């Protein structure tokens, strides 16, 4: 069992996404330990990219600012290495394929392992086209986590169930990331459809912004993923007190 899948064994997993270097590296290094202290089980470190197709305005803006700050995959690896000394929860990179491919798949995976990263999510890489990076990840002892959406076919679900390690990322709705007031009424049926095939833990993301939503989704999933709301709170409150309060509320809603 990997460190990532192990994070689902004792309780509903709370997974937090942040963009590395937003609004600056110093904040990232303060924010991640704070997230762990207040109940996060897995941290997703977003690698900024100039064309984040799966992301809504909040993460797009965070990615743009991080790029303006000079954040590259190399910088993200350095930040992860620093965080490894500060936290005990698993770290997962989330990033688009192009920067990782350009960096070098084998080198990237090896450096991830050295930096203490346990796996990664590449939202624009279908599992049927992931053989090269899957091989490099396996050699480095990393999990590669694939996504499914409500529109996914039974064939795609079977493929992801065969390929994904650590957990499966279930997208709550078609479209892009971003906090939303209403999540699909048939979300539970989607999760249950995947569960008939998959053995991995199932975590739901895209649109979760309140403890009430988290509590409802946790009734039929193994974990929840929150990102845009965290970045919004970071933007409005540099002290990070609002983020800490929000994460504690999410943790309480899941326990």
Swiss-Prot record:
Which residues constitute the catalytic centre?
44 (proton acceptor), 55 (proton acceptor)
One Pfam family recorded for the sequence: Trp_syntA
Pathway membership, UniProt = Amino-acid biosynthesis; L-tryptophan biosynthesis; L-tryptophan from chorismate: step 5/5
Gene3D superfamilies this protein is in?
Aldolase class I
Check the UniProt entry and state the signal peptide residues, or none: none
Which Gene Ontology cellular-component terms appear in the entry? Answer: cytosol
Q: What is its EC number?
A: 4.2.1.20
> Keywords, A to Z?
Amino-acid biosynthesis, Aromatic amino acid biosynthesis, Lyase, Tryptophan biosynthesis
Q: Which reaction does it catalyse?
A: (1S,2R)-1-C-(indol-3-yl)glycerol 3-phosphate + L-serine = D-glyceraldehyde 3-phosphate + L-tryptophan + H2O
Residue ranges annotated as coiled coil are none
Q: Which GO terms describe its molecular function?
A: tryptophan synthase activity
Q: Write down the CDD domains for this protein, in alphabetical order.
A: Tryptophan_synthase_alpha
Role according to the record: The alpha subunit is responsible for the aldol cleavage of indoleglycerol phosphate to indole and glyceraldehyde 3-phosphate.
- HAMAP family in the cross-refs: Trp_synth_alpha
Describe the family membership recorded for this protein in Swiss-Prot or TrEMBL. Belongs to the TrpA family.
Q: Which NCBIfam families match?
A: trpA
Subunit-level organization: Tetramer of two alpha and two beta chains.
Q: What is this protein called?
A: Tryptophan synthase alpha chain
| Annotated organism of origin | Dehalococcoides mccartyi (strain ATCC BAA-2266 / KCTC 15142 / 195) (Dehalococcoides ethenogenes (strain 195))
Q: Which gene encodes it?
A: trpA
């Amino acid at each position: 069992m990997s460190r990532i899948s192990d994070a689902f064994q004792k309780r509903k997993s709370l997974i937090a996404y942040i963009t590395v270097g937003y609004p600056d590296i110093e904040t990232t290094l303060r924010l991640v330990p704070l997230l762990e202290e207040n109940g996060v089980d897995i941290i997703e470190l977003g690698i900024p990219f100039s064309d984040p197709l799966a992301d809504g305005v909040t993460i797009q803006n965070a990615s743009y600012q991080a790029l303006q700050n000079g954040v590259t995959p190399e910088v993200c690896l350095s930040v992860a290495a620093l965080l490894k000394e500060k936290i005990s929860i698993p770290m997962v990179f989330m990033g688009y394929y192009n920067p990782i491919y350009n960096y070098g798949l084998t080198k990237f995976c090896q450096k991830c392992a050295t930096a203490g990263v346990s796996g990664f999510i590449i939202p624009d890489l279908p599992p049927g086209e992931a053989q090269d990076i899957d091989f490099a990840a396996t050699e480095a002892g990393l999990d590669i986590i694939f996504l499914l959406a409500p529109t996914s076919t039974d064939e795609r679900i079977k493929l992801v169930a065969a390929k994904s390690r650590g957990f499966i990322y279930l997208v709550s709705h078609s479209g892009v990331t971003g906090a939303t007031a209403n999540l699909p009424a048939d979300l539970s049926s989607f999760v249950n459809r995947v569960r008939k095939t998959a053995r991995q833990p199932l975590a739901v993301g895209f649109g979760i912004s309140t403890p009430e939503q988290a509590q409802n989704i946790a009734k039929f999933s193994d974990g929840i993923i929150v990102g845009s709301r965290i970045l919004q709170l970071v933007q409005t409150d540099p002290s990070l007190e609002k983020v800490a309060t929000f994460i504690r509320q999410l943790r309480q809603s899941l326990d």
